[in-house]
Regions:
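N-terminal secretory signal peptides and thylakoid transit peptides that target proteins
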Residues: 1-16
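ATP-dependent phospho-/nucleotidyl transfer catalytic cores
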Residues: 504
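Beta-strand-rich recognition domains
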Residues: 722-725
Length: 788
């Protein structure tokens, strides 16, 4: 069935519905439960989820999408410590003020504060050799983390540490057992692995700081800046710090050489400052720090605006209240305590990034390194992991937080205008990192247009998008347009680029139509099928092609490339997973693979294959079920593809197995990098029973709900999702009801859910093989996407 989106909405709202009474069913349609204020989502969250294994999350104290993430750093020199913290570590270096959440690359960790007793030590040491360094041992039994708060007792000094945060500031409270000191280390930060393929660690490499400044600016005020060249090469960060004790005894260091006594300010590259605290044991020592990407004056203004007082407990209470409101957008009832904790922690991790990157006065540093000004309502943000988050994180926001979704999308459009590189790829604090392939920001923008997000100036955006689509010859785009594929002997990651450029073409066609460029839109829609040039019917896999048109040899579907000299033909996946990457053209995949039965068999083979990977596979291909890899994003939509060939009950079985075996509420509870909330967003949506295989299409595919009841605050009201009878064995959907009537399709339009309503999944322990089997009940084939 080929439908435009307009046809889809009409059909979705008016197709023949069967009433429950006519079907002989009785459903509980009573009053909504759990609205009496007794639901406390903050108490269910464990920020430690994902801090172990390859999750790369941080237990730092922060607010939703805040600029500051104040938390402990245990290591900066290995891949699994990209966030600065790993649950396996036994020592803490100190507490820095911003951290990436779940990423596979490392940066930030600005303004490290080290509280200690005893002699002043300047050496950070290493996790393997902490002796003689300023690191201190700790036990997880002495840690506590909750949204907006972190606490730990340091074993070596006995200092009790508490941390909390506002949007732009972090607040510390230290209880010293004896005289001590605070060390501020501006040399501290990420030391990312130099080899992006092997992810080999380089713990001997220092953070690259080229310019820094530290200054005593008042009786209780310290200010500073640094210019850092790591993943975000050239970013600038400034801070203002107030301390609750006198700054009478301070010591400055440049490259660990002490400045003369009486020094009140210093400039250089490798700066540290020690505040000596002879009376530290007499009262708690309070520290509050604000950050700015603009200048020191901006940091001071942020500090005065958000943390004018010294009431640590009030800041902590306010943070908890903010998180209660944020997490209350999705409430779930029933299930096990483990499932409740996993769900709440996943929802929490979808609200860490992107991060605020605008001062309280409206100034921000843009993608052109210039200082701009706007309103707080417009805002500016950082840390968009778009290759990951276009899949589930941004679609989740279109449902549960459409205002925030619109703010992010409009910000991304502004970045496209400000950046010398055009469309953002992976922007971090005003710097384009150029990380990952494709320009999946266009998927985020197109989805927003399809779902009716307002305020997107498409006419101004389209020339930027068009230039990329038709004029840019870099990144393999010239052969992609000329040959229909990118040759593996000339361009790295050629197979994945060919596949993913097709997804982007599909999205750019929507933007073109919105701009009135319909001829360009038609060309882009046709070009979005280029992925088919890589499908090899002899092997049943997509394969890299060479310039002469032949498939690259040798071929092993487990490999990321065709030879050891140029082994990365695929991006964070192999041919097993990449064969199903055309999420925008599922009917096309079914056609080239030989029809419904053959497509179903290929999916079955993916999940049944031996999970062994080749020795050179990177660690971020993880969370394996067969050759399906939940631990990396290219697989995230694949379990839902069964709906297109009429067997959604297999989606239900696969999705429940993934949720049950690869997610839990422990530090190792994520199957891979959380990637700024994408890994967690997959769980949130899957637990609700829906997923957006093609975000641009504007439809949700049904899966298998995890909880008997969920309440979602949507833009149009409240969406209640019920699953009577759901349980460990009752994972199969028998029937679906929407607003009291039987719903015969295995999908539903976003426009339906966004208005709010009552979605009921009748569950059972055996598959209903008739549900979603009929061709007219399957997800539609889109010839084009019409705009609302």
């Amino acid at each position: 069935v080929a439908l435009s989106r307009r046809d889809l909405i009409k059909a979705s709202a008016t197709f023949a519905l069967v009433s429950p009474r006519a079907a002989g069913l009785r459903l509980a349609m009573g009053p909504i439960l759990g609205t009496s204020g007794d639901y406390d989502p903050v108490a269910l969250v464990d920020p430690m989820v994902g801090t172990g294994a390859h999750g790369h999350t941080t237990p730092a104290a922060c607010l939703p999408y805040g600029m500051v993430q104040l938390g402990p750093d245990t290591d900066t020199g290995r891949w699994d410590a990209c966030s600065g913290y790993h649950h396996d570590d036994a020592t803490i270096m100190g507490f820095s003020h911003n951290h990436l959440s779940g990423t596979g690359a490392s940066d930030l960790m600005d303004v490290l504060v080290v509280p200690r007793t005893g002699p002043l030590v300047l050496d950070p040491g290493t996790r393997e050799r902490p002796e003689g360094s300023y690191r201190q041992a700790f036990d997880h039994a002495d840690e506590r983390a909750e949204p907006g708060y972190y606490a730990v007792r340091l074993k070596d000094s006995g200092i009790a540490v508490e941390l909390t945060a506002t949007a732009r500031t972090g607040m510390h409270r230290y209880r010293f057992p004896a005289a001590g000191h605070l060390l501020i280390d501006l040399t501290h930060g990420a030391r990312p692995a130099p080899d992006p393929i092997s992810l080999r660690d380089d713990p001997a490499r220092d953070t690259d700081v080229t310019e820094a400044m530290l200054q005593i600016a008042g009786p209780d005020l310290i200010v500073g800046s640094r210019h850092v060249h790591e993943w975000a090469d050239g970013r600038q960060i400034h801070f203002a710090m107030r301390v609750s004790c006198a700054l009478d005894q301070v010591r400055f260091f440049n490259a660990d050489v002490e400045a003369p006594a009486g020094t009140r300010g210093i400039a250089g590259a490798l700066l540290k400052l020690a505040i000596m605290l002879p009376d530290a044991a007499t009262a708690p020592v309070l520290v509050k720090v604000a950050l700015s990407g603009v200048d020191v004056a901006g940091a001071i203004a942020n500090l005065d605006a958000e943390a004018p007082d010294w009431d640590f407990d009030q800041v902590r209470r306010a943070a908890r209240g903010t998180w209660t409101a944020q997490l209350g957008r999705v409430r779930v009832f029933g299930g096990t305590a483990e499932q409740q904790g996993t769900m709440a922690s996943a929802l929490y991790h979808t609200a860490i990034a992107p991060n605020l990157f605008i001062d309280s006065d409206g100034r921000y540093r843009g993608m052109d390194s210039a200082v701009h000004s706007t309103t707080q309502a417009v805002g500016n943000f950082s840390a968009y992991s778009l290759w990951d988050t276009y899949r589930a994180f941004h679609p989740l926001l279109t449902l549960v937080d459409p205002e925030r979704c619109g703010q992010f999308v409009r910000n991304l459009v502004t970045m496209a205008h400000e950046s010398p590189f055009g469309l953002p790829i992976w922007p971090l604090q005003g710097i384009e990192t150029h990380c990952m392939i494709g320009w999946h920001v266009v998927v985020v923008i197109a989805e927003a247009l399809v779902k009716g997000v307002k305020g997107i100036d498409v006419a101004a955006l389209w020339p930027i998008v068009r230039s990329l689509a038709f004029d840019d010859d870099g990144h393999g785009l010239e052969p992609y347009r000329r040959l229909g594929y990118i040759p593996a002997d000339t361009v790295r990651e050629s197979a994945s680029k060919t596949l993913e450029y097709g997804i982007d073409d599909w999205a750019m066609a929507v933007i073109a139509d919105a701009a009135g460029a319909h001829d360009d839109a038609a060309k882009l829609r046709a070009r979005s099928h280029n992925w088919r040039t890589l499908y090899d019917p002899q092997t049943g896999f997509v394969r890299p092609r060479l310039s002469d048109g032949t498939f690259a040899e040798p071929f092993d579907p487990r490999a990321l490339g065709h030879d050891s000299r140029h082994w990365r033909d695929f991006t964070e996946c192999n041919a097993w997973q990449a064969t199903f990457l055309a999420q925008h053209d599922v009917p096309g995949m079914i056609a080239v693979m030989g029809g419904d039965a053959a497509f179903e068999a290929r999916l079955d083979a993916l999940f049944a294959a031996d999970s062994t990977l080749l020795p050179d596979a990177p660690p971020d291909i993880s969370g394996m079920i067969g050759q399906y890899a939940q631990g990396n994003e290219p697989s995230h939509h694949v379990a839902y593809l069964y709906a297109w060939c009429g067997v959604p009950w297999k989606t239900q079985a696969r999705v429940r197995a993934i949720m049950d075996t690869l997610y839990n509420a422990t530090p190792a509870g994520l199957p891979g990098n959380d990637d700024c909330g994408q890994m967690s967003a997959w769980y949130v949506l899957s637990a609700l029973g829906i997923y957006p295989v093609d975000p641009v299409s504007g439809i949700w595919i049904f899966g298998t709900p995890l909880f008997p009841r969920a309440e979602v605050m949507v833009g149009g009201g409240r969406l209640v999702i019920e699953a009577p009878g759901v349980g460990p064995d009752a994972i199969y959907v028998q029937r679906v009801h929407w607003n009291g009537r039987v719903w015969n399709r295995s999908w539903i339009a976003h426009a339906e859910l966004a208005r709010g309503g009552h979605l009921v999944f009748e569950m059972g322990s055996h598959p209903n093989r008739d549900f979603g089997r009929a061709p007219e009940s399957r997800p539609p084939r889109f010839e084009s996407i019409a705009l609302p």
